[in-house]
């Protein structure tokens, strides 16, 4: 079996984090969603760590015995495989007057739930799994719904929201993306 970064399930914490930390992480996600839904892309970009890895692997349909091959391995083709520099380019494109894929802009609603926080061995670093639902309305009749799981590595940071995103893996539930484009951020 090919080993992929998703071969290992999210490691549940031995004990829950404090209610205060859980609340802080959830509030961070709610504010992040609001930034994206209100097209505050520069403010959202400021939440990304310099060493960010923003990855959405391609998912394939496999039989029960081939579930370990469901996702493409790291380094293979992916919907997104971005660094800080490529995310900056996507933000610049999205906010320019020449962004044909997003003119007029999409209207989005990011919903985040089922947030599970685990403190990592490195102080100030958290591993977080969450469920998401992203609704996008575009033009007059185009509607897209994306559902899945995000696996993030957050670092405590000196910014207004208290954290920065060091890694985001987006695991779509659907294997075939029916949307005209993927010009949204998850």
From Swiss-Prot:
One of its GO terms (biological process) is 3-phenylpropionate catabolic process. Keywords: Aromatic hydrocarbons catabolism, Dioxygenase, NAD, Oxidoreductase. Pathway: Xenobiotic degradation; biphenyl degradation; 2-hydroxy-2,4-pentadienoate and benzoate from biphenyl: step 1/4. Disulfide bonds: none annotated. SUPFAM superfamilies: NTF2-like. InterPro entries: NTF2-like_dom_sf, Rng_hydr_dOase-bsu. It catalyses: biphenyl + NADH + O2 + H(+) = (2R,3S)-3-phenylcyclohexa-3,5-diene-1,2-diol + NAD(+). Signal peptide: none annotated. GO terms for molecular function: biphenyl 2,3-dioxygenase activity. Its EC number is 1.14.12.18. It comes from the Bacteria. PANTHER family: 3-PHENYLPROPIONATE_CINNAMIC ACID DIOXYGENASE SUBUNIT BETA, BLR3401 PROTEIN. Belongs to the bacterial ring-hydroxylating dioxygenase beta subunit family. The beta subunit may be responsible for the substrate specificity of the enzyme. Heterohexamer consisting of 3 BphA subunits and 3 BphE subunits. A ferredoxin (BphF) and a ferredoxin reductase (BphG) must be present to obtain activity. NCBIfam families: PRK10069.1 (NF007479). This is Biphenyl dioxygenase subunit beta. The lineage of its organism: Bacteria, Pseudomonadati, Pseudomonadota, Betaproteobacteria, Burkholderiales.
């Amino acid at each position: 079996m090919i080993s992929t970064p998703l071969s290992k399930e999210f490691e549940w914490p031995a004990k829950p984090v404090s209610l205060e930390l859980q609340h802080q992480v959830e509030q961070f996600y709610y504010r992040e969603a609001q930034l994206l839904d209100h097209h505050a892309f520069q403010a959202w970009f400021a939440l990304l760590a310099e060493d960010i890895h923003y990855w959405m692997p391609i998912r394939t349909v496999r039989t029960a015995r081939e579930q370990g091959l469901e996702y493409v391995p790291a380094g293979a083709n992916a919907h997104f495989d971005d660094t800080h520099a490529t995310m900056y380019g996507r933000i610049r494109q999205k906010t320019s007057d020449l962004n044909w894929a997003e003119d007029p802009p999409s209207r989005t609603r990011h919903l985040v739930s089922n947030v599970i926080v685990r403190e990592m061995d490195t102080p100030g670093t958290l591993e977080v799994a969450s469920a998401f639902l992203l609704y996008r309305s575009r033009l007059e009749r185009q509607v897209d719904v994306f559902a899945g799981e995000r696996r993030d590595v957050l670092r405590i940071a000196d910014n207004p929201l208290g954290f920065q995103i060091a890694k985001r893996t987006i695991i779509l539930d659907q294997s075939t993306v029916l949307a005209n484009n993927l010009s949204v951020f998850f």
